[in-house]
Amino acid sequence: MEQQELFDVTVIGGGPAGLYSTFYSGLRGMKTKLIEYQAELGGKIHVYPEKMIWDVGGQPPITGAKLMEQLVEQGLTFNPTVHLNEKIISITKDVFGNFVLEAESGMIHYSKTVIVAVGGGILNPQKLKIEGAERYEVSNLNYTVKSIERFKDKTVIISGGGNSAIDWANELEPVAKKVYVTYRKDCFTGHEAQVEQLVNSSAVCLLNTTIHKLIASDDHHRIASVELIDCTTNETVALEIDEVIINHGYEQDAELLANCDLDLQQVDDFYIAGTASSESSVPGLYAAGDILSHEGKVHLISGAFQDAANAVNRAKKYIEPEAPKVAMVSSHNEVFKKRNRELIQEMVNQNR
């Protein structure tokens, strides 16, 4: 199926870099499309919705969920065309020099320019390799912690020894009834301070162990207990639990760039080699966020915003060489004049 409509810019990836690219391209009057693989916008922040984020300039500490909400609202300011659940698998060019984006669904998208903002690629959590485990994903087998409240007063076992697993254990220890942490190696690999906090807490750390079996409840809808096996002695022990959390890392899906039929230079066979202005080796194709690699690259959400603005400005000049290099700042931009009046009136009404 083809989307015959030609867009000025198509943004691939709906995380912070992609959402800000979408906002800024709308600000620059560009006909914009945003394509996201997941069912909702927000990107990797979905992995830690209740974690506090401190390093966005001018923004007081904010939860990942709230920041996502604000980023999505801002990204949709200029009513871009949005495609969710759409995985782009290849990028080519047609005879007219326009980009042709092929989706796994068979959909074809056309665009004058492209901004790749896929972060570290499509991240799929590594699943628990136990037969039949997937049936518990609708009940109490978790691959992320979306709400700490869900685990209040419950017995929880976390499998994993990296930063995320240790962070989750420390977050849940004060609210859960009991926290177990099982890890197949003899020491955790998370940040030293976080590991120290964990081992000095009430959580029970079970090193050199791994989940061997899931034992179902009487109705077979939930996991009632887990059987751990000691990796050194092969001894087993069963623990009654309410919730199981698995954090064994993520699998990176880099199919998009691997199938890019263009002379796109990469770093480490994954990241897009670019410039500080977000340009790639392919004219008209830009990168923003963690997927962009160059000397001096800042891997922060704040850095992604600058990448996005640079990418959009370059895309605008690529399409319209006579266009200004940058957009008018928002405080003096006529685009926001009507909305500013509405916001000021809202503030006046709230203060009455």
Swiss-Prot record:
Homodimer. This is Ferredoxin--NADP reductase 2. It comes from the Bacteria. Its EC number is 1.18.1.2. It is an enzyme of class 1 (oxidoreductase). InterPro entries: FAD/NAD-bd_sf (IPR036188), FAD/NAD-binding_dom (IPR023753), Fd--NADP_Rdtase_type_2 (IPR022890), Ferredoxin-NADP_redctase_2 (IPR050097). The lineage of its organism: Bacteria, Bacillati, Bacillota, Bacilli, Bacillales. Its cofactor is FAD. It comes from Exiguobacterium sibiricum (strain DSM 17290 / CCUG 55495 / CIP 109462 / JCM 13490 / 255-15). One of its GO terms (molecular function) is NADP binding. The keyword Flavoprotein applies. Belongs to the ferredoxin--NADP reductase type 2 family. Binds 1 FAD per subunit. Gene3D superfamilies: FAD/NAD(P)-binding domain (3.50.50.60). Coiled coil: none annotated. Keywords: FAD, Flavoprotein, NADP, Oxidoreductase.
